[in-house]
């Protein structure tokens, strides 16, 4: 059910110009590159205090810290002169990359902002692949624990 809610939110946001489904799909595919058996939209949305929309408090584990770092990376992207986003949103930036085995390479043809966002997503996907997944942190009560 939560997946359907996420899909609906992504569709509405994309229709309003906020989130590009293609950009979200790129990040999803990067995670699939490093963790082929994962289902990123299901596994990592609504995990801990930072994985999913928004984030606050102290990360509950290493994986949640990966999401906090990814959020921070996107915040840094917003400060770059080369990154002027539609509706101030890094999720709209499309970039080029390749996946070979579990190795992600951001294309040298990316412009500065694309390269920055690609590396944010690449670093997060690699971080996810190294962090343990704790099922008890999925759908965490963020009001209580964050």
Swiss-Prot record:
**Pro-peptide region(s):** 16-22
**InterPro entries named among the record's database cross-references:** PLipase_A2, PLipase_A2_Asp_AS, PLipase_A2_dom, PLipase_A2_dom_sf, PLipase_A2_His_AS
Q: What is this protein called?
A: Phospholipase A2
Q: How does it assemble?
A: Monomer or homodimer.
What start and end residues bound the annotated signal peptide?
1-15
PTM details? Activated by trypsin cleavage in the duodenum. Can also be activated by thrombin or autocatalytically.
Function statement: Secretory calcium-dependent phospholipase A2 that primarily targets dietary phospholipids in the intestinal tract. Hydrolyzes the ester bond of the fatty acyl group attached at sn-2 position of phospholipids (phospholipase A2 activity) with preference for phosphatidylethanolamines and phosphatidylglycerols over phosphatidylcholines. May play a role in the biosynthesis of N-acyl ethanolamines that regulate energy metabolism and inflammation in the intestinal tract.
Which class of enzymes does this protein belong to? hydrolase
Task: Write down the SUPFAM superfamilies for this protein, in alphabetical order.
Answer: Phospholipase A2, PLA2
Q: Which cysteines are joined by disulfide bonds?
A: 33-99, 49-146, 51-67, 66-127, 73-120, 83-113, 106-118
Q: What detail does the entry give on cofactor binding?
A: Binds 1 Ca(2+) ion per subunit.
State the PROSITE patterns in the record.
PA2_ASP, PA2_HIS
Q: What is its main location?
A: secreted
> Which sites bind Ca(2+)?
50, 52, 54, 71
Query: Which cofactor names does the annotation list?
Result: Ca(2+)
Q: What is its EC number?
A: 3.1.1.4
Its GO CC terms are:
cell surface; extracellular space
Q: Where in the cell is it found?
A: Secreted
Residue numbers annotated as active site: 70, 121
**Family recorded in the similarity comment:** Belongs to the phospholipase A2 family.
Query: What is a biological process (GO) this protein takes part in?
Result: fatty acid biosynthetic process
């Amino acid at each position: 059910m939560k997946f359907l809610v996420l899909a609906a939110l992504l569709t509405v946001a994309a229709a309003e110009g906020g989130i590009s489904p293609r950009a979200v799909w790129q990040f999803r595919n990067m995670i699939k590159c490093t963790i082929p058996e994962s289902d990123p939209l299901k596994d990592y949305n609504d995990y801990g205090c930072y994985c999913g929309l928004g984030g606050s408090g102290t990360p509950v584990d290493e994986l949640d810290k990966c999401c906090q770092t990814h959020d921070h990376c996107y915040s840094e992207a917003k400060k770059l002169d080369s990154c002027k986003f539609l509706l101030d949103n890094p999720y709209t930036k499309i970039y080029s990359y390749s996946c070979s085995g579990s190795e992600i390479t951001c294309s040298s043809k990316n412009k500065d902002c694309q390269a920055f966002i690609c590396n944010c997503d690449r670093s997060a996907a690699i971080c996810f692949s190294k962090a343990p997944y704790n099922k008890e942190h999925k759908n965490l009560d963020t009001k209580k624990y964050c």
